[in-house]
């Protein structure tokens, strides 16, 4: 009877999964519908806690915002990108955005749900990116937040957890769980994105950069630099799922598509 109740409860939770459209297509035409089991509010609240945990932990080691010029540069780029996020979702410019630079040799950057950005000094020091290239990185990471890829991945993880929980209960095996804040940290810092998520972030990222007055072709030169790191293996944070050549080709196509937006926007900056 208990097993039956667990099964019914789990199936009910799965049935409650919503199909949503998180963003408008934009010029790049990203319009995939997504299945969500958890609300934006829940994920964003957990992401805010997760971000504070990560930043506070780094600050205690003296690893946050050590170089004033670096921080000013990163935040200036963020302040140009954030207003144009409204192209894809009207609520995004009003998010409680935060941008910090973390001192680490790791070539990394990320944006947690709700607009919590971190750029690592290893990325800046090792790649020596131009502003266009740095905008490409940040636009890509912001795109993950706009598309709510974090929420989608949490939903997938919870769905898998429900299924495993039912199977475990039937087998008499207890399934340990991870709280939402810990799950957000794990997915953001430790787990690579899927090919589908990376491609969407690439395409939306170049449009964000272009609309903010950054040359979208910076994404191409950035990826070429990425490919030279580690003997041709790009960093983990930009998943290796899309092959190097396919990714470059896709970036060329979509950078060209949004080039008129850049030509118009750069006159304002």
What is each of the regions a protein language model found here?
Residues 2-5, 17-269:
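A Zn2+-metalloprotease active-site environment signal
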């Amino acid at each position: 009877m208990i097993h039956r109740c667990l099964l019914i409860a789990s199936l009910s939770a799965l049935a409650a999964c919503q199909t949503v459209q998180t963003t408008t297509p934009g010029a790049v035409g990203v319009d995939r519908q997504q299945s969500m089991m958890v609300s934006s509010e829940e994920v964003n609240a957990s992401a805010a806690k997760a971000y504070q945990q990560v930043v506070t932990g780094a600050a205690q080691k003296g690893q946050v915002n050590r170089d004033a010029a670096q921080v000013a540069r990163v935040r200036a780029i963020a302040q140009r990108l954030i207003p144009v996020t409204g192209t894809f979702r009207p609520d995004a410019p009003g998010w409680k955005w935060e941008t910090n630079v973390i001192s680490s040799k790791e070539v990394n950057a990320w944006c947690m749900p709700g607009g919590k950005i971190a750029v690592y000094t290893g990325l800046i020091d090792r790649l020596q990116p131009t502003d266009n290239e740095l905008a490409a990185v940040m636009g890509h990471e912001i795109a993950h937040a706009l598309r709510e890829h974090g929420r989608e991945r949490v939903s997938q993880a919870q769905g898998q957890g429900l299924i495993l929980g039912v199977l475990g209960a039937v087998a008499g095996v207890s399934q340990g769980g991870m709280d939402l804040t810990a799950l957000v940290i794990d997915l953001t810092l430790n787990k690579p994105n899927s090919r589908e998520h990376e491609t969407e972030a690439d395409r939306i990222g170049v449009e964000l950069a272009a609309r903010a007055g950054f040359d979208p072709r910076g994404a191409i030169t950035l990826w070429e630099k990425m490919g030279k790191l580690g003997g041709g293996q790009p960093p983990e944070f930009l998943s290796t799922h899309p092959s190097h050549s396919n990714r470059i080709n896709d970036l060329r196509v979509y950078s060209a598509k949004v080039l008129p937006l850049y030509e118009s926007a750069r006159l304002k900056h």
